[in-house]
């Protein structure tokens, strides 16, 4: 017999799989993402200017960047080299540092100043601040300035009254109140008088160092990954000087009075260059260009140094009261836009993959970055993909101190957890406007609760498989499981397609919501024979995805959100499951047996103690114990703070229900009393008190003329007679009840 050969094999047909596309601001459309170097991605992100507390506007960008970074790295598998800068040399920092220093000195002296001298200085402060208010044209800022002016005037009035009373203690209190309320106007006044005298660089270093630390703490609190490389402007001045010199050598920058400016028109005329790639319609927007130059760099003498109003500063000559570094053009400091160009290029070279920033930085900052970098390298492209996060509004309004809706990150974290904030961002597109409001956060909170209940149920229902013999961990597979598995697979396909489509986390979470819903239906309909392995696979997939999104921190391998330990630090849920749960289950089993016996014996005091253990004692320990109609009970380890909030909400709901019941009872009693009082009215007198309607009545008490003296119509008299007849019936019933009594 001849040897048989293998039959022909039919290769499966290739299926088109979705490719990762990102919305590129350089083209204003979604583009296939193709890194310059295979699987390696170079990424530069604009960091903060550190002179004040980080707010939700910062969170909008940095949480979104973190989500994008994690997904590209942990889901798509790219090797990302992530660089972020810290702007610690800037006009805002210089002015704020100078003013803080001068105010602190003044406040210490002002406590000892004679009152007439202090009040005399106050008039100078007031005059300068009133001039500032008059010049301002920004409506929101004007509201804020007017409120500051009002508070300052009120504080001065209070101080003047205290002086009149001669009460030294009250004078001291009102003096301090004035200094606090007028801090900004006083600081500005002092800066105008003494700002040029500040020449200690330590003054300009302390402020950004402090706020940089606060920024990093905020990022850690939000579970945002630190950058691989952090660049500070103050540590890059020599490289920035070299970078500027390259632009000068290429004929696209010029020195003027110890400053250096970028030649926008000269750049735009060159064939390979194009100014304002991101926002071409903003070319010539001098207002935005001046804002980008900085508060200390828009005086007439500075503006007159430019060849064109479109030109912008690469190097600023420092005046008295400003920090400086040596350069070939004189003592000065870097311009804002050149900082990012020089630092990113120092790390990555002449081109890199991704540049990210807030949408408000498109023009002029990012457009100027592109221009000066392309000028330095004499290339037509510096960045391949420019990604911009959308604006953030507060309850539909622009975030503004004047509107009293300015929310710092720490203030936001007092109301909602980092997980809830991240879920709110995940439920919105990263490139669109996000409205931070009660409605937005309620959606995020409910989504978190929805997922958490699913995780807790799965862990409770499938916990036994971890302790049983290996063979018992595999349950029978039926059509029901096959249907759920198909929906599970479809959800994975939908999630992948969503993430490929410009990292659409909102659609991905919608697919997860649907998967959890069908899984909950499976649990409801198959309580007696659940396939534990399938349920755990679904829950583990969702948990891993939330890890990728940064919504869950800590080690992987468990199911659900981590449970907070007694110290408040997040412990690994799997560790608590292993170490704590056996003891809690023993307690729950003992309580169950006691409770069943108490039911039999009708021992209500013992039942009350069992309820107290469930409702008050265990929640304080992070344990939710649920009594079941079918089966014994369910034990779930939950974050203690979440449980306490649940309990408070439940108690509040019960209190509201009781209050509503009492309100209805009171309303019913009042209605009954009113009805009883109405029965006692003689029908002939029922209209006599309505003098605001009628002016004359007949012998039976029926109105004959209205308040203006006109006769009441026949139709109206018929209606009144009917009402009187009804009252007569009620009145007779009342008289009968008295006689009977």
Curated annotation (Swiss-Prot):
Keywords: Aminoacyl-tRNA synthetase, ATP-binding, Cytoplasm, Ligase, Metal-binding, Nucleotide-binding, Phosphoprotein, Protein biosynthesis, Zinc. It catalyses: tRNA(Cys) + L-cysteine + ATP = L-cysteinyl-tRNA(Cys) + AMP + diphosphate. Zn(2+) binds at residues 46, 340, 365, 369. Its cofactor is Zn(2+). GO terms for molecular function: ATP binding; cysteine-tRNA ligase activity; metal ion binding; tRNA binding. GO terms for cellular component: cytoplasm. Its EC number is 6.1.1.16. A motif ('HIGH' region) lies at residues 48-58. The modification Phosphoserine is found at residue 297. Its main location: cytoplasm. One of its GO terms (biological process) is cysteinyl-tRNA aminoacylation. A motif ('KMSKS' region) lies at residues 398-402. SUPFAM superfamilies: Anticodon-binding domain of a subclass of class I aminoacyl-tRNA synthetases, Nucleotidylyl transferase. PANTHER family: CYSTEINE--TRNA LIGASE, CYTOPLASMIC (PTHR10890:SF3), CYSTEINYL-TRNA SYNTHETASE (PTHR10890). This is Cysteine--tRNA ligase, cytoplasmic. It comes from Drosophila melanogaster (Fruit fly). The gene is CysRS.
């Amino acid at each position: 017999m001849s040897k048989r050969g293998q039959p022909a094999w039919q290769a499966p047909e290739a299926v088109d799989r979705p490719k990762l596309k990102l919305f590129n601001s350089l083209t204003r459309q979604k583009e296939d993402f193709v890194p310059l170097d295979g699987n390696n991605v170079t990424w530069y992100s604009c960091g903060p200017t550190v002179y004040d507390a980080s707010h939700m506007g910062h969170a909008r960008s940095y949480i979104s960047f973190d989500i994008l970074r994690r997904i590209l790295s942990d889901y798509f598998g790219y090797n990302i080299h992530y660089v972020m800068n810290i702007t610690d040399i800037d006009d805002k920092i210089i002015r704020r540092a100078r003013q803080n220093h001068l105010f602190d000195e003044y406040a210490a002296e002002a406590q000892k100043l004679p009152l007439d001298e202090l009040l005399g200085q106050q008039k100078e402060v007031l005059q300068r601040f009133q001039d500032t208010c008059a010049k301002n044209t920004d409506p929101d800022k004007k509201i804020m300035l007017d409120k500051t002016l009002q508070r300052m005037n009120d504080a001065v009035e209070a101080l003047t009254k205290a002086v009149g009373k001669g009460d030294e203690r009250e004078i001291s209190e009102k003096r301090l109140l004035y200094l606090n309320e007028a801090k900004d106007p006083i600081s500005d006044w002092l800066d105008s008088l003494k700002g040029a005298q500040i020449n200690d660089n330590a003054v300009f270093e302390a402020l950004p160092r402090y706020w940089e630390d606060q920024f990093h703490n905020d990022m850690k609190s939000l579970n945002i990954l630190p950058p691989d490389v952090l660049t500070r402007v103050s540590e890059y001045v020599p490289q920035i000087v070299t970078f500027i010199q390259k632009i000068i050598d290429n004929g696209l920058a010029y020195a003027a009075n110890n400053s250096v400016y970028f030649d926008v028109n000269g750049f735009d005329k060159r064939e390979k260059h194009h100014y304002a790639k991101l926002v071409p319609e903003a070319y010539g927007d001098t207002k935005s260009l001046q804002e980008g130059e900085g508060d200390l760099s828009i005086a007439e003498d500075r503006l007159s140094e430019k060849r064109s109003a479109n030109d912008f500063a690469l190097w600023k000559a420092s005046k008295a009261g400003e920090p400086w570094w040596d350069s070939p053009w004189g003592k000065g400091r870097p311009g804002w836009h050149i900082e990012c160009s020089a630092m990113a290029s120092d790390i990555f070279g002449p081109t890199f993959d991704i540049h990210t920033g807030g949408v408000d930085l498109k023009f002029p900052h990012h457009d100027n970055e592109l221009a000066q970098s392309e000028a330095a390298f004499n290339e037509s492209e510096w960045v391949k993909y420019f990604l911009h996060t959308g604006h953030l509004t507060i309850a539909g309004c622009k975030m503004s101190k004047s509107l009293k809706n300015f929310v710092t990150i720490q203030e936001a974290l007092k109301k909602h957890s980092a997980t809830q904030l991240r879920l709110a961002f995940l439920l919105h597109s990263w490139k669109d406007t996000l409205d931070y409001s009660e409605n937005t956060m309620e959606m995020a909170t409910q989504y978190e609760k929805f997922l958490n209940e699913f995780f807790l149920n799965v862990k409770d229902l499938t916990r036994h498989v971890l302790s049983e013999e290996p063979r018992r961990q595999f349950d029978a597979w039926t059509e029901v499981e096959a249907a759920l598995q198909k929906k599970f697979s479809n959800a994975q396909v939908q999630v992948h397609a969503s993430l490929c489509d410009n990292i659409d986390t909102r659609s991905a979470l919608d697919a997860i919501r649907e998967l959890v819903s069908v899984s909950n239906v499976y649990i409801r309909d198959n309580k007696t024979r659940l396939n534990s392995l399938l349920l755990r696979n679904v829950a583990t997939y969702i948990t891993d995805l939330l890890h990728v999104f940064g919504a869950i921190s800590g080690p992987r391998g468990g199911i659900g959100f981590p449970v907070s330990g007694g110290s408040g630090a997040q412990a690994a849920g799997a560790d608590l499951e292993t170490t704590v749960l056996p003891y809690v289950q023993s307690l729950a089993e003992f309580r169950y047996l006691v409770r069943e016996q108490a039911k039999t014996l009708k021992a209500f005091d013992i039942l009350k103690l069992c309820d107290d253990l469930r409702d008050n004692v265990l929640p304080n320990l992070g344990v939710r114990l649920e009594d079941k109609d079918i089966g014994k009970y369910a034990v779930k380890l939950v974050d203690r703070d979440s449980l306490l909030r649940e309990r408070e909400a439940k108690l509040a709901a019960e209190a509201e229900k009781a209050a509503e019941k009492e309100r209805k009872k009171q309303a019913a009693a009042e209605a009954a009393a009113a009805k009883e009082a109405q029965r006692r009215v003689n029908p002939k007198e029922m209209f006599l008190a309505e003098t605001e309607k009628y002016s004359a009545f007949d012998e039976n008490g029926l109105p004959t003329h209205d308040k203006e003296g006109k006769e009441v119509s026949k139709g109206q008299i018929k209606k009144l007679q009917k009402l009187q007849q009804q009252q007569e019936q009620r009145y007779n019933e009342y008289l009968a009840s008295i006689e009977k009594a």
